[in-house]
Amino acid sequence: MLKTKDTVLEIDNIVKEFPVGKNGKMTACNKVSLCFEKGKTLGIIGESGCGKSTLMKIVMQLEKPTSGQILYHGEDITKLKGEKLRQHRRNIQMVFQDPTTAFNPKMKVKDIICEPLLNFGLIKKGEKEEVAKKYLEMVELPAEFMDRYPHNMSGGQRQRIGIARALVLDPEVLI
C-alpha cells in the first residue's frame, strides 16, 4: 500500500470474519490494504463471494471489521459513533448493487434523490423538484421521472437513480 499526499481514504489490514456454526468462522476479508487517492478511480475485482461487497460495507460503516482500520484523512472511522458517524457519511457515498432493495418503495424518485439533503438540512422541501430535476438530467433521465416510484422503472433506470442519490451530497469518495 503506497500512501501519498493525495490519499483520501486508506484501508489498513482489514479483516472481517463471520461466525459459522458453534466454533467456526468464515473469513470474508483477510488483511486487505488499499489507498484511495483524490481524483482517481480504483476498481476492485474478484470472483463472487471473495469479499468485495463486504469490504465496501465496512468502508461505509454498515459492517464493523474484525480488525484493521479505515482512515479518512488520517482519522480512523471504524471508531466513529452517533453524530460524528452521521456527519462523516456525507463525505463517502455508495451506489448499492441492487437499487431495488436500497430504496423505500413508497417514496417517489424526487424524494429518494433529495432525502440525504433533507436529512442534513441542506435544502428545504420546496426545493426538491429543482434539485431532483438537476440530478435526473445529470444521470440522463427525464425530469418527469421525479414523480414515479422505483418499482415502475427498469433496473438500469433504478441504478441511475441510485447514482443520482449518491452524487447529491457531493461526496469526496463514491463507492
State each model region's role.
Residues 60:
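Helix-to-loop junction immediately C-terminal to a conserved catalytic motif
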Residues 76, 127-144:
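Conserved ABC ATPase "signature" region
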Residues 45-47:
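The feature captures the beta-strand-to-loop junction immediately N-terminal to the Walker
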Residues 151, 169:
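Conserved signature/switch motifs of ABC ATPase nucleotide-binding domains
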Residues 68-76:
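Conserved ABC transporter NBD signature motif
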Residues 22, 77-93, 119:
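ABC ATPase NBD coupling module
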